[in-house]
């Protein structure tokens, strides 16, 4: 089963570092961002519930690829640290204590640690551009363990930077209309043992 994911970025009133730093005297923007995070978490919890039902039959039967744009909401890192809110990707992959339902990333750890699919100005870093990986391909145990009929081709999960770069108008690449998408695509090869 292919499960296309596009969590909503759920824009909030929290837009600037000044708002974050002023949260004690003017909490409304941060409270709004917390509500946004709760909505994202609820969206992911529901998706996780559905995926668990599908893959709980065991690795030989539950073949699921969950892929797409996993927006993690405004100020995700500081919200997680300040309020002990979980990362939505961590929520979605499940628990290693339930190995028949635990998803893994299709990308090799070495590549995953430096990969990015989007670039944006981060208000927490003075408006500097930062790069992040928010587009992911997650595999159910039936695929990543090799116990089922579908298998991940080793080292096949990549960010398609070359294809994306080939279609960017370099002169004004920061403008959205001069890029093929706001995110670089990610690809993977899944082989069938049929």
Predicted segment positions?
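Structured beta-strand-rich core segments of catalytic domains in phosphoester-bond hydrolases
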Residues: 1-12
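Metal-dependent phosphoester-hydrolase catalytic domains
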Residues: 53-65, 70-194
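A solvent-exposed, charged loop/short amphipathic helix patch at secondary-structure junctions
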Residues: 10-37
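A long, amphipathic alpha-helix that forms part
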Residues: 30-59
């Amino acid at each position: 089963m292919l499960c296309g994911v596009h969590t909503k970025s759920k824009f909030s009133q929290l837009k600037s570092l000044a708002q974050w730093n002023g949260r004690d005297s003017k909490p409304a923007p941060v409270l709004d961002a917390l509500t946004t995070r709760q909505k994202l978490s609820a969206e992911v919890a529901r998706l996780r519930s559905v995926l668990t039902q599908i893959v709980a039959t065991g690795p030989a039967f539950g073949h699921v690829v969950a892929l797409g744009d996993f927006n993690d909401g405004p100020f995700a890192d500081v919200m997680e640290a300040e309020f002990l809110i979980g990362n939505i990707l961590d929520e979605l992959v499940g628990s290693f204590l339930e190995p028949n339902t635990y998803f893994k990333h299709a990308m090799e750890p070495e590549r995953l640690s430096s990969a990015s699919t989007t670039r944006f100005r981060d208000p927490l870093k003075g408006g500097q551009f930062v790069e992040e990986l928010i587009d992911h391909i997650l595999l159910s145990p039936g695929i990543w363990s090799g116990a089922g009929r579908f298998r991940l081709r080793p080292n096949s999960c990549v960010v398609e930077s070359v294809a994306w770069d080939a279609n960017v108008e370099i002169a004004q690449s920061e403008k959205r209309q001069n890029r093929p998408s706001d995110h670089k695509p990610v690809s993977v090869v899944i082989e069938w043992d049929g």
